[in-house]
UniProtKB/Swiss-Prot annotation:
Keywords: Cytoplasm, Decarboxylase, Lyase, Porphyrin biosynthesis. Its EC number is 4.1.1.37. The gene is hemE. Substrate binds at R27, Q28, A29, G30, R31, D77, Y154, S209, H327. GO terms for biological process: protoporphyrinogen IX biosynthetic process from glutamate. This is Uroporphyrinogen decarboxylase. It comes from the Bacteria. It is found in: Cytoplasm. Catalyzes the decarboxylation of four acetate groups of uroporphyrinogen-III to yield coproporphyrinogen-III.
Length: 354
């Protein structure tokens, strides 16, 4: 495999010295970029983009052609796993993802297959291989999956939800059915992430978008515990390199200490947690990734720069910080403002690494 030209993202995750704080953005390949919108139009629809390895590669690389980012992230969707389980994923304009065959009964859960990514998600693995080839060692490639709880919410609700009523009802009224569903998702996600690592992903992130919707103990039982099982089963070294694992629970600030005990390399933070406080709480056990509010990108470039400076100062000196947004970049952001954010991270962070 090609030697990495820029490995500061991987180095920061391992707490090794870096020259500047590395930066990438969740959803960096997305609708805020005109070139992404053009490629998506060629693909016909979102799933047409996800399932075409050449086009998925094209949009993965677009932000790197525009900005000096320190990592690429595979262009895909967390719902590829339930789609491969037979739920029939489709997208309705203005309404987001939907499933034709939601899972709501014990019989439906029992009938669900465990995903074999090599057989059922070859288009994702082909995209990983294509992207790695095209990157040619420029920066590392991040693979990802949704967390079992987050995937379960979409599968049970049949799409997005504001209150997760059906999913939570299953947790509390039929916990054994919920556990069986989560167990199948643990096996599927573990297989999927390991397949991405074998295909060339140099780090992986577990997106737990809806863990923060759970009660304190319910999070530990139904979200963190399944993620712990995945972490235990992941390939952690491949082709002579450590494979870092990042765990990101949106709204997960109250559980940082428990998350840091899972054996992951890093925790993603949303914008509601102070990163300096988080650093004190995890005590060097894990690196931290985050955590600017994506809405700051609507402000002036000088205000963006000020907020970047504030977060860097809060984290303080030394490695172990990967700068990112606290959630995905939103479609209406001016690409110039995204560039100002990335440049500010590199320019303002150098003094923290001397």
């Amino acid at each position: 495999m090609t030697e990495l030209k820029n490995d500061r993202f991987l180095r920061a995750l391992q707490g090794q010295p870096v020259d500047v704080t590395p930066v990438w953005m969740m959803r960096q390949a997305g609708r805020y970029l005109p070139e992404y919108r053009a490629t998506r139009a060629r693909a016909g629809d979102f799933m047409g983009l996800c399932t075409n390895p050449q086009l998925a590669c094209e949009v993965t690389l677009q932000p790197l052609q525009r900005y000096p980012l320190d990592a690429a992230i595979l262009f895909s969707d967390i719902l590829t796993v339930p789609d491969a389980m037979g739920l029939g994923l489709y997208f309705e304009t203005g309404e987001g993802p939907k499933f034709r065959n939601p899972v709501r009964t014990a019989a439906q859960v029992e009938a669900l297959p465990v995903v074999n990514a090599e057989n059922e998600l070859t288009y994702v693995l082909d995209a990983v291989k294509t992207i790695r080839h095209e990157l040619n060692g420029a920066v590392p490639l991040i693979g990802f999956s949704g967390s079992p709880w987050t995937l379960m919410t979409y599968m049970v609700e049949g799409g997005s939800s504001k209150d997760f009523r059906r999913s939570k009802a299953m947790l509390y009224s039929e916990p054994e059915v919920a556990r069986l569903l989560l167990d199948k998702l643990v096996a599927s996600v573990t297989d999927y992430l390991n397949a991405q690592i074998r295909a060339g992903a140099q780090a992986v992130q577990i997106f737990d978008s809806w863990g923060g919707a759970l009660a304190h103990d319910a999070y530990l039982e139904f979200s963190l515990k399944p993620m712990q099982q995945i972490v235990n089963g992941l390939i952690r070294e491949h082709q002579g390199r450590q494979v870092p694992v990042i765990l990101f629970t949106k709204g997960g600030g109250q559980w940082l200490e428990a998350m840091a005990e899972t054996g992951v390399t890093a925790l993603g933070l949303d914008w509601t947690t102070d990163i300096g406080n988080a650093r004190e709480r995890v005590g060097g056990k894990v690196a931290l990734q985050g955590n600017m509010d994506p809405s700051v990108l609507y402000a002036s470039t000088s205000a963006i720069r000020d907020e970047v400076g504030r977060i860097l100062a809060s984290y303080g000196h030394g490695s172990g910080h990967v700068f990112n947004l606290g959630h995905g970049i939103t479609p209406e952001v001016d690409p110039v403002h995204a560039g100002a954010f990335i440049n500010a991270v590199h320019e303002l962070s150098a003094g923290y690494h001397q």
